[in-house]
């Protein structure tokens, strides 16, 4: 039953040097070649499935695994010193296959190793980690033979020749396996230079770190005061007599804001008083505002018993002056001041009548000054007819002179200051004719609100326009 051990396949005979720096993560045991071959043998021979028992030895931070496989009631132990469970199981399967080959007769059929595509994947992963080019496979076919295909793989500038195979795919897999075995054998570097087992324990990667030269640690930098304020003292400029002084982070009066923004000077706006004169040369009508004097008395509309010479005011109408804008409005000049026109009372006023004697006219008393409403339009007052008044007749016809607004009468704007008007001395027309004036007896003069007149330049409605003498103060 015992047969001499089968010589190693030709792919293991490749002793070409492998590139340095092989990583321990890529190992041949990941191909599961020996476990697969042992499983196939058990199925062909009608044996039970191989059972693997793996043991963990050594300290927890550096564990060492050892595996044992049981097949046909026979146990086979793996090599000691593996750092992972899979490598230990692959080693146990390889040992079992080597012993089975020795024990079976020569005519016994041992299935060949079924290569898998995992070897090609592992070789490509190794090339990527080593920054090598993708492995290239070159296959050749011989003229005759059971295994006509032979494949060669090149990685890292080194070519690895695989064993012969029946198909091109199997030839590439065998070439990849040969390259992996060569890389692993060169990286581990066995002491005797050769071994009959392919799966052998490797060196721990962690030990290489200890060989690195110890770098001299750099001295730590001393941190400066961590509680140092990150802002500097704020400086403020003096503006408009308002100074801000800062000493030892102490604020004084005048520093209202704790910010980096410079303080803006205080802008004082003076409101225009009532007596301010606004002159606007670009506008047609100018606005003149005047504050009424303090000694102005309100005309009581409901009082009937007034002074004997006082003018009666109707209860429904207050003494008011209405200013209605006319068509030809005279514009107040820009530099003209507020003009106050008063009609001064005359003593022993006499009205000259054309073609007749002058009649004596009694003066109408003046009660201080009527309060002119600020927000109302100025109105005109019409003097009503008196009972015992001698009416002057012009052209031998009785007619009352009503002072009505003329078309070309100069009327101030609604916002122009109200003017206080007093009756003046006898008015004389330029052609020598005197206007008809009505003498107002005691408690007889009544201010009529429906009819209005305009103060200022007044023109009578007669054929000859009368003229009044106005004194401007």
From Swiss-Prot:
Residue spans of biased composition, Basic and acidic residues class: 286-307, 317-327, 416-427
Gene3D superfamilies per UniProt: 3.30.160.20
Biased composition (Pro residues): 1-10
InterPro entries referenced in this protein's UniProt entry, alphabetically: dsRBD_dom
Pfam families according to UniProt: dsrm
Biological process per Gene Ontology, one example term: regulation of gene expression
Keywords, sorted A to Z: Repeat, RNA-binding
GO cellular component: nucleus
Domain DRBM: 33-102, 118-185
Region (Disordered): 1-22, 286-329, 393-473
MF terms in GO: double-stranded RNA binding; ribonuclease III activity
Residue ranges with Polar residues bias: 433-450
UniProt superkingdom: Eukaryota
Physiological role: Binds double-stranded RNA.
Name the UniProt record assigns to this protein: Double-stranded RNA-binding protein 7
Record organism: Oryza sativa subsp. japonica
């Amino acid at each position: 039953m015992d047969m001499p051990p089968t010589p190693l396949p030709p792919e293991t005979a490749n002793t070409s040097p492998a590139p340095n720096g092989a990583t321990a993560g890529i190992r041949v045991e990941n191909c599961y070649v020996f476990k697969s071959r042992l499983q196939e043998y058990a199925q062909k021979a009608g044996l039970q499935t191989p059972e693997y028992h793996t043991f963990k030895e050594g300290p927890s931070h550096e564990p060492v695994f050892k595996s044992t496989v049981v097949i046909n009631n026979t146990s086979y132990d793996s090599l000691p010193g593996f750092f992972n469970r899979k490598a230990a199981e692959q080693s146990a399967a390889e040992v079992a296959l080597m012993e089975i080959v020795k024990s079976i007769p020569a005519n016994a059929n041992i299935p060949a190793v079924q290569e898998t595509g995992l070897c090609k994947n592992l070789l490509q992963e190794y090339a990527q980690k080593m920054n090598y080019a993708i492995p290239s496979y070159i296959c050749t076919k011989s003229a005759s033979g059971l295994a006509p295909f032979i494949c060669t793989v090149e990685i890292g500038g080194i070519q690895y020749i695989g064993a012969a195979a029946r198909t091109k795919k199997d030839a590439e897999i065998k070439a990849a396996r040969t390259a992996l075995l060569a890389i692993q054998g060169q990286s581990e570097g066995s002491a005797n230079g050769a071994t009959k087992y392919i799966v052998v324990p490797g060196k721990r990667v962690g030990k290489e770190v200890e060989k690195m030269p110890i770098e001299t640690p750099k001295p730590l930098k001393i941190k400066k005061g961590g509680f140092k304020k990150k802002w500097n003292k704020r400086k403020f400029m003096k503006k408009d007599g308002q100074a801000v002084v800062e000493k030892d982070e102490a604020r004084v009066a005048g520093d209202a804001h704790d910010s980096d923004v410079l303080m803006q000077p205080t802008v004082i706006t003076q409101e225009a008083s009532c007596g301010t004169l606004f002159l606007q040369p670009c506008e047609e009508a100018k606005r003149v505002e005047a504050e009424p004097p303090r000694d102005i008395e309100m005309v009581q509309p409901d009082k009937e018993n007034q002074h004997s010479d006082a003018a009666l005011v109707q209860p429904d109408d207050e003494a008011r002056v209405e200013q209605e804008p006319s068509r030809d409005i005279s514009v107040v000049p820009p530099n003209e001041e507020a003009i106050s026109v008063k009609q001064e009372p005359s003593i022993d006023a006499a009205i000259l009548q054309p073609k007749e004697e002058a009649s004596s006219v009694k003066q109408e008393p003046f009660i201080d000054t009527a309060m002119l409403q600020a927000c109302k339009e100025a109105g005109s007052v019409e003097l009503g007819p008196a009972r015992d008044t001698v009416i002057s007749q012009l052209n031998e016809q009785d007619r009352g002179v009503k002072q009505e607004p003329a078309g070309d009468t100069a009327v101030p704007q609604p916002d122009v200051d109200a003017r206080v008007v007093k009756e003046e001395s006898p008015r004389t027309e330029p052609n020598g004719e005197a206007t008809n004036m009505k003498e107002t007896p005691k408690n007889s003069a009544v201010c009529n609100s429906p009819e209005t007149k305009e103060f200022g330049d007044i023109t009578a409605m007669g054929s000859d326009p009368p003229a009044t003498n106005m004194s401007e103060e």
